[in-house]
Amino acid sequence: MPQLSGGGGGGGGDPELCATDEMIPFKDEGDPQKEKIFAEISHPEEEGDLADIKSSLVNESEIIPASNGHEVARQAQTSQEPYHDKAREHPDDGKHPDGGLYNKGPSYSSYSGYIMMPNMNNDPYMSNGSLSPPIPRTSNKVPVVQPSHAVHPLTPLITYSDEHFSPGSHPSHIPSDVNSKQGMSRHPPAPDIPTFYPLSPGGVGQITPPLGWQGQPVYPITGGFRQPYPSSLSVDTSMSRFSHHMIPGPPGPHTTGIPHPAIVTPQVKQEHPHTDSDLMHVKPQHEQRKEQEPKRPHIKKPLNAFMLYMKEMRANVVAECTLKESAAINQILGRRWHALSREEQAKYYELARKERQLHMQLYPGWSARDNYGKKKKRKREKLQESASGTGPRMTAAYI
Protein backbone atom coordinates (compact mmCIF):
# COMPACT_ATOMS: atom_id res chain seq x y z
CA MET A 1 0.00 0.00 0.00
CA PRO A 2 1.37 3.42 -0.83
CA GLN A 3 1.69 5.54 2.26
CA LEU A 4 -0.05 8.88 2.70
CA SER A 5 2.04 11.97 2.31
CA GLY A 6 0.65 13.55 5.50
CA GLY A 7 2.77 14.62 8.41
CA GLY A 8 1.02 12.43 11.00
CA GLY A 9 2.25 9.06 9.72
CA GLY A 10 -0.06 6.23 8.64
CA GLY A 11 -2.99 6.84 11.02
CA GLY A 12 -2.62 10.43 12.07
CA GLY A 13 -3.90 12.03 8.86
CA ASP A 14 -7.31 13.22 7.82
CA PRO A 15 -9.77 10.27 7.74
CA GLU A 16 -11.31 11.45 4.44
CA LEU A 17 -7.93 11.41 2.69
CA CYS A 18 -6.83 8.22 0.96
CA ALA A 19 -4.08 6.91 -1.30
CA THR A 20 -3.87 8.35 -4.79
CA ASP A 21 -4.32 4.98 -6.52
CA GLU A 22 -7.63 4.10 -4.85
CA MET A 23 -11.06 4.69 -6.40
CA ILE A 24 -13.16 7.50 -4.90
CA PRO A 25 -16.88 6.73 -5.38
CA PHE A 26 -19.11 9.78 -5.86
CA LYS A 27 -22.28 10.04 -3.87
CA ASP A 28 -24.58 10.64 -6.87
CA GLU A 29 -23.20 7.64 -8.87
CA GLY A 30 -25.59 4.76 -9.71
CA ASP A 31 -28.80 6.40 -8.50
CA PRO A 32 -31.64 4.42 -10.16
CA GLN A 33 -34.23 7.18 -9.76
CA LYS A 34 -32.10 9.76 -11.57
CA GLU A 35 -31.33 7.35 -14.40
CA LYS A 36 -35.01 6.55 -14.86
CA ILE A 37 -35.99 10.23 -14.91
CA PHE A 38 -33.21 11.03 -17.40
CA ALA A 39 -34.29 8.17 -19.69
CA GLU A 40 -37.94 9.32 -19.64
CA ILE A 41 -36.96 12.91 -20.44
CA SER A 42 -34.53 11.99 -23.26
CA HIS A 43 -36.51 9.44 -25.37
CA PRO A 44 -40.09 8.97 -24.21
CA GLU A 45 -41.50 8.40 -27.69
CA GLU A 46 -38.81 5.97 -28.84
CA GLU A 47 -39.29 3.71 -25.85
CA GLY A 48 -42.98 3.56 -26.57
CA ASP A 49 -42.32 2.75 -30.23
CA LEU A 50 -39.83 0.04 -29.32
CA ALA A 51 -42.31 -1.50 -26.91
CA ASP A 52 -44.98 -1.54 -29.64
CA ILE A 53 -42.55 -3.15 -32.09
CA LYS A 54 -41.54 -5.84 -29.62
CA SER A 55 -45.11 -6.69 -28.66
CA SER A 56 -46.27 -6.82 -32.30
CA LEU A 57 -43.40 -9.10 -33.29
CA VAL A 58 -44.09 -11.48 -30.40
CA ASN A 59 -47.79 -11.68 -31.26
CA GLU A 60 -47.10 -12.27 -34.96
CA SER A 61 -44.59 -15.05 -34.28
CA GLU A 62 -47.07 -16.84 -32.00
CA ILE A 63 -50.23 -16.49 -34.13
CA ILE A 64 -49.15 -16.70 -37.78
CA PRO A 65 -48.04 -20.19 -38.97
CA ALA A 66 -44.75 -20.79 -40.76
CA SER A 67 -46.43 -21.30 -44.17
CA ASN A 68 -47.33 -17.59 -44.51
CA GLY A 69 -43.70 -16.45 -44.64
CA HIS A 70 -44.26 -13.63 -47.13
CA GLU A 71 -47.09 -12.11 -45.10
CA VAL A 72 -44.94 -12.19 -41.96
CA ALA A 73 -42.12 -10.40 -43.73
CA ARG A 74 -44.49 -7.74 -45.03
CA GLN A 75 -46.04 -7.10 -41.61
CA ALA A 76 -42.61 -7.02 -40.00
CA GLN A 77 -41.60 -4.39 -42.53
CA THR A 78 -44.74 -2.38 -41.75
CA SER A 79 -43.97 -2.53 -38.05
CA GLN A 80 -40.37 -1.50 -38.62
CA GLU A 81 -41.17 1.65 -40.62
CA PRO A 82 -41.91 3.85 -37.56
CA TYR A 83 -38.55 2.83 -36.17
CA HIS A 84 -36.88 3.87 -39.42
CA ASP A 85 -38.66 7.22 -39.32
CA LYS A 86 -37.40 7.81 -35.81
CA ALA A 87 -33.93 6.75 -36.84
CA ARG A 88 -33.93 9.27 -39.69
CA GLU A 89 -35.15 12.06 -37.42
CA HIS A 90 -32.64 11.19 -34.66
CA PRO A 91 -29.61 9.62 -36.31
CA ASP A 92 -27.48 9.88 -33.18
CA ASP A 93 -30.06 8.74 -30.63
CA GLY A 94 -31.85 6.03 -32.59
CA LYS A 95 -29.16 3.34 -32.60
CA HIS A 96 -30.29 -0.11 -31.53
CA PRO A 97 -28.44 -1.90 -28.77
CA ASP A 98 -27.96 -4.98 -30.95
CA GLY A 99 -25.72 -3.14 -33.37
CA GLY A 100 -28.06 -0.84 -35.31
CA LEU A 101 -27.92 -2.81 -38.52
CA TYR A 102 -31.24 -1.37 -39.79
CA ASN A 103 -30.08 2.22 -39.62
CA LYS A 104 -28.02 2.08 -42.81
CA GLY A 105 -29.72 -0.43 -45.10
CA PRO A 106 -33.27 0.00 -46.47
CA SER A 107 -35.99 -2.55 -45.92
CA TYR A 108 -36.82 -4.59 -49.00
CA SER A 109 -40.14 -6.18 -49.88
CA SER A 110 -40.35 -9.50 -51.72
CA TYR A 111 -40.54 -9.10 -55.50
CA SER A 112 -41.05 -12.22 -57.63
CA GLY A 113 -38.72 -12.50 -60.59
CA TYR A 114 -36.12 -10.13 -59.11
CA ILE A 115 -32.68 -10.78 -57.79
CA MET A 116 -31.78 -8.76 -54.72
CA MET A 117 -28.40 -7.08 -55.11
CA PRO A 118 -28.13 -4.45 -52.39
CA ASN A 119 -25.39 -1.87 -52.30
CA MET A 120 -22.27 -3.87 -51.43
CA ASN A 121 -20.35 -0.86 -50.16
CA ASN A 122 -22.92 0.51 -47.70
CA ASP A 123 -24.48 -2.57 -46.13
CA PRO A 124 -22.63 -3.60 -42.97
CA TYR A 125 -23.58 -7.27 -43.22
CA MET A 126 -21.97 -7.59 -46.66
CA SER A 127 -18.65 -6.00 -45.74
CA ASN A 128 -17.14 -9.21 -44.38
CA GLY A 129 -17.02 -10.82 -47.83
CA SER A 130 -20.05 -13.11 -47.36
CA LEU A 131 -22.28 -13.52 -50.39
CA SER A 132 -25.16 -15.18 -48.56
CA PRO A 133 -28.17 -12.89 -47.96
CA PRO A 134 -29.36 -12.09 -44.45
CA ILE A 135 -32.44 -13.68 -42.96
CA PRO A 136 -34.26 -11.95 -40.11
CA ARG A 137 -34.44 -13.61 -36.72
CA THR A 138 -35.60 -12.37 -33.35
CA SER A 139 -33.12 -11.75 -30.55
CA ASN A 140 -34.56 -10.24 -27.34
CA LYS A 141 -37.82 -9.66 -29.28
CA VAL A 142 -36.04 -7.37 -31.74
CA PRO A 143 -35.27 -8.37 -35.36
CA VAL A 144 -31.57 -8.98 -35.94
CA VAL A 145 -29.89 -9.69 -39.27
CA GLN A 146 -27.99 -12.94 -39.44
CA PRO A 147 -26.49 -14.49 -42.63
CA SER A 148 -27.57 -18.00 -43.52
CA HIS A 149 -24.78 -20.57 -43.88
CA ALA A 150 -26.72 -23.82 -44.39
CA VAL A 151 -27.95 -23.06 -47.93
CA HIS A 152 -26.23 -22.21 -51.17
CA PRO A 153 -25.01 -18.58 -51.24
CA LEU A 154 -27.03 -17.63 -54.32
CA THR A 155 -30.17 -19.79 -54.10
CA PRO A 156 -32.19 -17.47 -51.81
CA LEU A 157 -31.56 -14.52 -54.13
CA ILE A 158 -33.18 -15.83 -57.30
CA THR A 159 -36.84 -16.69 -57.80
CA TYR A 160 -38.29 -19.02 -60.39
CA SER A 161 -40.81 -16.65 -61.93
CA ASP A 162 -40.55 -15.51 -65.56
CA GLU A 163 -42.20 -12.15 -64.87
CA HIS A 164 -40.19 -9.00 -65.44
CA PHE A 165 -40.77 -5.58 -63.95
CA SER A 166 -39.05 -2.33 -64.61
CA PRO A 167 -36.88 -1.32 -61.65
CA GLY A 168 -38.61 2.01 -61.16
CA SER A 169 -42.26 0.82 -61.21
CA HIS A 170 -44.20 -0.61 -58.31
CA PRO A 171 -45.77 -4.06 -58.95
CA SER A 172 -49.53 -4.04 -59.13
CA HIS A 173 -50.07 -7.31 -57.24
CA ILE A 174 -48.26 -6.05 -54.13
CA PRO A 175 -50.43 -3.83 -51.94
CA SER A 176 -48.94 -0.62 -50.68
CA ASP A 177 -47.89 -0.59 -47.06
CA VAL A 178 -50.06 1.34 -44.65
CA ASN A 179 -48.57 3.22 -41.74
CA SER A 180 -50.58 2.30 -38.67
CA LYS A 181 -49.91 5.54 -36.82
CA GLN A 182 -50.18 8.16 -39.57
CA GLY A 183 -53.06 6.46 -41.43
CA MET A 184 -51.65 7.13 -44.92
CA SER A 185 -50.49 4.73 -47.61
CA ARG A 186 -46.77 4.54 -48.31
CA HIS A 187 -44.84 2.98 -51.16
CA PRO A 188 -41.31 1.65 -50.88
CA PRO A 189 -38.75 4.41 -51.41
CA ALA A 190 -37.88 4.92 -55.06
CA PRO A 191 -34.06 5.18 -54.67
CA ASP A 192 -34.01 1.73 -53.05
CA ILE A 193 -35.86 -0.09 -55.84
CA PRO A 194 -33.19 0.24 -58.60
CA THR A 195 -30.98 -2.09 -56.59
CA PHE A 196 -33.32 -4.93 -57.70
CA TYR A 197 -32.41 -6.46 -61.06
CA PRO A 198 -34.68 -8.79 -63.09
CA LEU A 199 -33.05 -12.07 -64.00
CA SER A 200 -34.72 -14.90 -65.88
CA PRO A 201 -33.85 -18.51 -65.04
CA GLY A 202 -32.67 -19.18 -68.59
CA GLY A 203 -30.20 -16.33 -68.62
CA VAL A 204 -28.55 -17.13 -65.34
CA GLY A 205 -24.86 -17.85 -65.85
CA GLN A 206 -21.80 -17.95 -63.74
CA ILE A 207 -21.82 -14.72 -61.75
CA THR A 208 -18.27 -13.51 -61.25
CA PRO A 209 -17.69 -11.97 -57.81
CA PRO A 210 -16.27 -8.44 -57.51
CA LEU A 211 -12.73 -7.72 -56.46
CA GLY A 212 -13.64 -7.76 -52.79
CA TRP A 213 -14.77 -11.41 -52.90
CA GLN A 214 -11.65 -13.05 -54.34
CA GLY A 215 -11.36 -15.42 -51.39
CA GLN A 216 -14.69 -17.24 -51.98
CA PRO A 217 -15.32 -19.35 -55.10
CA VAL A 218 -18.62 -18.88 -56.92
CA TYR A 219 -20.04 -21.81 -58.85
CA PRO A 220 -22.56 -21.69 -61.69
CA ILE A 221 -26.11 -22.10 -60.44
CA THR A 222 -27.75 -23.00 -63.74
CA GLY A 223 -27.65 -26.73 -62.94
CA GLY A 224 -29.75 -26.30 -59.79
CA PHE A 225 -33.05 -25.86 -61.67
CA ARG A 226 -34.59 -26.57 -65.04
CA GLN A 227 -33.90 -24.16 -67.85
CA PRO A 228 -36.83 -23.31 -70.16
CA TYR A 229 -34.39 -21.83 -72.67
CA PRO A 230 -31.46 -23.45 -74.50
CA SER A 231 -28.08 -23.34 -72.79
CA SER A 232 -26.56 -21.43 -75.71
CA LEU A 233 -28.69 -18.37 -74.95
CA SER A 234 -26.65 -15.18 -74.75
CA VAL A 235 -26.25 -13.86 -71.25
CA ASP A 236 -25.42 -10.34 -72.38
CA THR A 237 -29.09 -9.21 -72.45
CA SER A 238 -29.80 -10.24 -68.88
CA MET A 239 -26.41 -9.33 -67.48
CA SER A 240 -26.27 -5.86 -69.07
CA ARG A 241 -28.35 -4.43 -66.22
CA PHE A 242 -25.68 -5.24 -63.67
CA SER A 243 -23.06 -2.67 -62.88
CA HIS A 244 -19.62 -3.08 -64.44
CA HIS A 245 -17.78 -3.40 -61.13
CA MET A 246 -19.81 -6.48 -60.23
CA ILE A 247 -19.72 -8.46 -63.50
CA PRO A 248 -16.67 -8.05 -65.75
CA GLY A 249 -16.83 -8.53 -69.49
CA PRO A 250 -16.04 -11.72 -71.35
CA PRO A 251 -12.43 -12.85 -71.14
CA GLY A 252 -10.50 -11.58 -74.13
CA PRO A 253 -6.99 -12.26 -75.35
CA HIS A 254 -4.01 -11.79 -73.10
CA THR A 255 -3.19 -8.15 -72.42
CA THR A 256 0.37 -8.49 -73.59
CA GLY A 257 -0.63 -10.34 -76.76
CA ILE A 258 1.42 -13.40 -75.82
CA PRO A 259 -0.49 -16.66 -76.31
CA HIS A 260 -1.02 -19.02 -73.45
CA PRO A 261 1.95 -21.27 -72.64
CA ALA A 262 -0.21 -24.35 -73.12
CA ILE A 263 -0.64 -23.38 -76.77
CA VAL A 264 3.05 -22.79 -77.44
CA THR A 265 4.65 -25.68 -75.61
CA PRO A 266 3.30 -28.49 -77.86
CA GLN A 267 5.02 -26.95 -80.88
CA VAL A 268 8.29 -26.67 -79.03
CA LYS A 269 8.01 -30.24 -77.83
CA GLN A 270 7.46 -31.37 -81.41
CA GLU A 271 10.59 -29.60 -82.58
CA HIS A 272 12.91 -31.01 -79.90
CA PRO A 273 12.73 -34.63 -81.10
CA HIS A 274 13.71 -33.51 -84.61
CA THR A 275 16.78 -31.69 -83.34
CA ASP A 276 17.82 -34.63 -81.19
CA SER A 277 17.37 -37.03 -84.09
CA ASP A 278 19.48 -34.80 -86.35
CA LEU A 279 22.29 -34.75 -83.80
CA MET A 280 22.08 -38.53 -83.46
CA HIS A 281 22.38 -38.89 -87.23
CA VAL A 282 25.33 -36.49 -87.47
CA LYS A 283 27.49 -38.22 -84.87
CA PRO A 284 27.47 -41.70 -86.44
CA GLN A 285 28.36 -40.29 -89.86
CA HIS A 286 31.39 -38.48 -88.43
CA GLU A 287 32.49 -41.60 -86.60
CA GLN A 288 32.05 -43.71 -89.71
CA ARG A 289 34.31 -41.39 -91.69
CA LYS A 290 37.00 -41.72 -89.05
CA GLU A 291 36.72 -45.49 -89.13
CA GLN A 292 36.95 -45.58 -92.91
CA GLU A 293 40.18 -43.57 -92.93
CA PRO A 294 43.34 -45.73 -92.48
CA LYS A 295 44.97 -45.27 -89.09
CA ARG A 296 48.50 -43.99 -89.63
CA PRO A 297 50.89 -44.90 -86.81
CA HIS A 298 52.41 -42.09 -84.77
CA ILE A 299 56.02 -41.69 -85.95
CA LYS A 300 58.35 -40.12 -83.43
CA LYS A 301 60.91 -37.67 -84.58
CA PRO A 302 64.65 -38.61 -84.34
CA LEU A 303 66.42 -37.72 -81.09
CA ASN A 304 68.95 -34.88 -81.01
CA ALA A 305 72.30 -34.85 -79.14
CA PHE A 306 70.94 -33.50 -75.82
CA MET A 307 68.08 -36.00 -75.76
CA LEU A 308 70.50 -38.83 -76.40
CA TYR A 309 72.62 -37.61 -73.47
CA MET A 310 69.52 -37.41 -71.21
CA LYS A 311 68.50 -40.91 -72.22
CA GLU A 312 71.91 -42.26 -71.25
CA MET A 313 72.54 -40.31 -68.03
CA ARG A 314 69.00 -40.20 -66.56
CA ALA A 315 69.37 -43.45 -64.63
CA ASN A 316 72.56 -42.24 -62.97
CA VAL A 317 70.97 -38.97 -61.81
CA VAL A 318 67.93 -40.78 -60.37
CA ALA A 319 70.25 -43.15 -58.47
CA GLU A 320 72.34 -40.33 -57.03
CA CYS A 321 69.48 -38.00 -56.05
CA THR A 322 66.39 -38.69 -54.00
CA LEU A 323 64.31 -36.43 -56.24
CA LYS A 324 61.49 -38.02 -58.15
CA GLU A 325 60.20 -34.97 -59.97
CA SER A 326 60.88 -34.98 -63.70
CA ALA A 327 61.40 -31.23 -63.91
CA ALA A 328 64.08 -31.25 -61.25
CA ILE A 329 65.85 -34.19 -62.90
CA ASN A 330 65.78 -32.42 -66.29
CA GLN A 331 67.33 -29.31 -64.73
CA ILE A 332 70.21 -31.35 -63.29
CA LEU A 333 70.79 -33.04 -66.64
CA GLY A 334 70.80 -29.70 -68.41
CA ARG A 335 73.43 -28.29 -66.09
CA ARG A 336 75.65 -31.32 -66.62
CA TRP A 337 75.19 -31.10 -70.39
CA HIS A 338 76.44 -27.54 -70.48
CA ALA A 339 79.37 -28.52 -68.23
CA LEU A 340 80.63 -31.02 -70.77
CA SER A 341 83.50 -30.13 -73.09
CA ARG A 342 83.30 -29.93 -76.88
CA GLU A 343 84.85 -33.34 -77.39
CA GLU A 344 82.36 -35.02 -75.07
CA GLN A 345 79.41 -33.24 -76.73
CA ALA A 346 80.74 -34.13 -80.24
CA LYS A 347 80.27 -37.81 -79.44
CA TYR A 348 76.51 -37.27 -78.85
CA TYR A 349 76.21 -35.08 -81.96
CA GLU A 350 77.58 -37.94 -84.04
CA LEU A 351 75.03 -40.32 -82.54
CA ALA A 352 72.25 -37.86 -83.34
CA ARG A 353 73.33 -37.63 -87.00
CA LYS A 354 73.24 -41.40 -87.36
CA GLU A 355 69.77 -41.41 -85.77
CA ARG A 356 68.49 -38.95 -88.36
CA GLN A 357 69.87 -40.95 -91.26
CA LEU A 358 68.25 -44.12 -89.98
CA HIS A 359 64.91 -42.31 -89.55
CA MET A 360 65.05 -41.01 -93.12
CA GLN A 361 65.67 -44.48 -94.45
CA LEU A 362 62.76 -45.93 -92.47
CA TYR A 363 60.28 -43.08 -93.19
CA PRO A 364 61.38 -41.37 -96.39
CA GLY A 365 58.35 -39.04 -96.80
CA TRP A 366 57.95 -38.17 -93.14
CA SER A 367 57.86 -34.57 -91.94
CA ALA A 368 57.54 -33.10 -88.47
CA ARG A 369 54.45 -31.22 -89.62
CA ASP A 370 52.54 -34.49 -89.71
CA ASN A 371 52.74 -34.71 -85.91
CA TYR A 372 52.28 -31.04 -85.02
CA GLY A 373 49.60 -30.23 -87.60
CA LYS A 374 47.02 -32.85 -86.61
CA LYS A 375 44.76 -30.37 -84.78
CA LYS A 376 44.70 -28.04 -87.75
CA LYS A 377 43.78 -30.91 -90.04
CA ARG A 378 40.85 -31.83 -87.81
CA LYS A 379 39.56 -28.24 -87.94
CA ARG A 380 39.83 -28.23 -91.72
CA GLU A 381 37.84 -31.44 -91.95
CA LYS A 382 35.08 -30.04 -89.75
CA LEU A 383 34.86 -26.89 -91.85
CA GLN A 384 34.60 -28.92 -95.03
CA GLU A 385 31.83 -31.07 -93.54
CA SER A 386 29.84 -28.00 -92.48
CA ALA A 387 30.23 -26.47 -95.94
CA SER A 388 29.10 -29.69 -97.64
CA GLY A 389 25.60 -29.57 -96.03
CA THR A 390 25.73 -31.04 -92.56
CA GLY A 391 25.91 -27.69 -90.80
CA PRO A 392 23.04 -25.88 -92.56
CA ARG A 393 20.70 -28.77 -91.81
CA MET A 394 21.46 -28.48 -88.11
CA THR A 395 20.93 -24.72 -88.09
CA ALA A 396 17.63 -25.08 -89.94
CA ALA A 397 16.42 -27.50 -87.30
CA TYR A 398 16.95 -24.95 -84.52
CA ILE A 399 15.07 -22.18 -86.31
Curated annotation (Swiss-Prot):
GO biological process, one term: cell chemotaxis
Stretches with biased composition (Basic and acidic residues): 24-45, 82-98, 269-296
The keyword Nucleus is annotated on this UniProt entry: yes
UniProt note on tissues of expression: Detected in thymus. Not detected in normal colon, but highly expressed in colon cancer biopsies and colon cancer cell lines. Expressed in several pancreatic tumors and weakly expressed in normal pancreatic tissue. Isoforms 1 and 5 are detected in several pancreatic cell lines.
Top-level taxon: Eukaryota
Modified residues (Phosphoserine): S132, S166
UniProt biased composition (Gly residues): 1-14
Entry keywords, A to Z: Activator, DNA-binding, Isopeptide bond, Nucleus, Phosphoprotein, Transcription, Transcription regulation, Ubl conjugation, Wnt signaling pathway
InterPro entries: Catenin-bd_sf, CTNNB1-bd_N, HMG_box_dom, HMG_box_dom_sf, TCF/LEF
Compartments (UniProt record): Nucleus
Gene Ontology CC: one annotated term: nucleoplasm
Residue ranges: DNA binding: 299-367
Comment text on domains: Proline-rich and acidic regions are implicated in the activation functions of RNA polymerase II transcription factors.
Family label: Belongs to the TCF/LEF family.
Role summary: Transcription factor that binds DNA in a sequence-specific manner. Participates in the Wnt signaling pathway. Activates transcription of target genes in the presence of CTNNB1 and EP300. PIAG antagonizes both Wnt-dependent and Wnt-independent activation by LEF1. TLE1, TLE2, TLE3 and TLE4 repress transactivation mediated by LEF1 and CTNNB1. Regulates T-cell receptor alpha enhancer function. Required for IL17A expressing gamma-delta T-cell maturation and development, via binding to regulator loci of BLK to modulate expression.
Name of the protein described by the UniProt record: Lymphoid enhancer-binding factor 1
Organism: Homo sapiens (Human)
Name of the coding gene: LEF1
